[in-house]
Amino acid sequence: MNETKKRSIAILGSTGSIGTQTLQVVEEHPDKFEVYAITANTRVDELIQQARKFMPEAVVIADESKYKQLKEALADLPIKVYGGYESICQIVESKPIDIVVTAMVGFSGLRPTINAIKAGKAIALANKETMVVAGELINELAMKHRTPILPVDSEHSAIFQCLAGEMNNKVEKLILTASGGPFRTFTKEQLEHVTVQQALKHPNWSMGAKLTIDSASMMNKGFEVMEAKWLFGVGAEDIEVVVHPQSVIHSMVQFGDGAIKAQLGTPDMRLPIMYALTYPTRLSSSFERIDWNTLKELTFEKPNLELFPNLQHAYTAIAQGGNIPCVVNAANEICVAAFLEERIKFTDMPKLIARAMEKATYILKPTLDDYLETDREIRAMVKEWI
């Protein structure tokens, strides 16, 4: 990092969990970062507060019905105000931006990420759906435009850190750790009666609603396997998921000689966020440290694929390839929304996803338009079933 010049950041999804924690990192090091642009989907009040506090050059609200309110609230400040999803796709191309934090939830993060890569911006990747849906396309674009993609997910950040300095050494496998979520010890019968409130209580991490449900169903871990495949160029057969309830080891890499490197830390998303923003430098932080005196044990177990079929769906989707990962993502987004609205049971989600995988029109080499069409088609189909 150039020590004199501040790194200019755009945060897509600044009012969400990752977005707000990114702003906390900026507050921790105001001499290192400046916020060029922040965007939100619908949370206009939080966006107004953030704009007043961080004074970005530009602010975008995707929900156009909130544009007038945003514009009026910031009228006394020299901030450019935009409305609509297209504006988010365009703002990432702004010349002063050095790094784009893709903290939007779901498929909507894909197009802005593609535009940012084409504009040569470094990507701090928090929107895992981008790699799940279109990992191959993203990798090709990143290579073509020589754009670094820096993982923000704690697991992928851990692997990224473990691989540092190992460029010429054989990687035998990546080991992704999973907390197991709040229902790790449940029976099939208990899972049938899970409530939204129960599912939203994650034992270790603080996250948004969508991600918390994905963690409870282990779909999140499935997505992380897909993401790891594209980020690190390994086959799914070389990615192992291990349940580690304490969430102290964030992930591991096993090398050809049998040695294993692990990255440990407190379950605090600000750590991987900061590393992505400052790579290859490490800044000091005031964040909590591990207390080795109170840490009693680190335990590990196999994931239960019978209880959590979503993880198996992810491996199946990788094996089938083409647009099937996109199918899984679209079906899952509709299922999670329906579960949060209490229209389906927790155990209905993996069943609907499996059905979508069966019914989808298979495309071996999808283009961006194919991904968009698959996404539309599957969402409509699953909505109809619900």
Which sequence ranges carry the predicted segments?
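Catalytic, metal-anchored helix/loop core of enzyme active sites in primary metabolism
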Residues: 1-386
